[in-house]
Amino acid sequence: MFGTNFLRSAGKGLNCSMAEYLNCPGWLHRLPSIYKLIISLAVATIVSAALMPIKMENMTRVMIGWDCFSVSMMIFSGLIFLSMRPRQIRVLAKQEDAGRIVVFGIVLAATIGSLVGIMLLLGNKDWLLGKSVETFIYISGVICSWFLLHTLFTYRYALLYYGDHPLDPDTHTVGLQIPNELWPDYLDFAYFAFVIGMTFQVSDIEISSRTIRRVALVHGLLSFLFNTVIVALTINVVVDLKS
């Protein structure tokens, strides 16, 4: 059966030891998820503190911090996506790292919360920094939240794909059948995640795992919510700027 053969050939083809992973170049690959979160929070805090002398709404200050946090997280992610090889992702997925789940939940909740904050800010009429400046901050927040959402799910799909198969720990779960690609890298998973984010469907990649299918369902629903809010915010901004 194609699915079974695919799973075994892909899983065994990427099997590698912890030593091989640790010897791979790049300290960033070995940096725990929680440390990336802490560093990004530190960047956001420093920038927000540096802007304390400037008079602005507290929520505007928080939004600037959120933009810095999001950009920092995406820089980490971009560097990892472009440099990490499939066999490294496989070993990473085998590690018991509860911090990854915690970071995923925290950042996902913060991303959703940022949209609520942006909607509240758009009702503000004080514009202490000027209408155009604050509008730019809010739009940047929406864009950062959108990219960060799909970046989070890129990580999730990759770790689910390369996690141990429950019936055979020597192979990985797979769960996604990517045409002509047995050993996908992070950019393949980014393609899958961002296509769902933009179209609410999975295009040419077939889902064969119940767990990934459920994650994709949640991802699609959140993407629909985000895109609906983005359209509403865009209309609000255009009307507000014309008034």
Each model region followed by its residue ranges:
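The first (N-terminal) embedded transmembrane alpha-helix
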Residues: 30-51
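Membrane-helix interface/capping segments
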Residues: 78-96, 119-127, 159
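Transmembrane alpha-helix/helix-exit interface in multi-pass inner-membrane proteins
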Residues: 144-166
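Juxtamembrane helix-capping/reentrant segments at transmembrane boundaries
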Residues: 89-109
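Short, Lys/Arg-rich, polar N-terminal cytosolic tail immediately upstream
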Residues: 2, 6-30
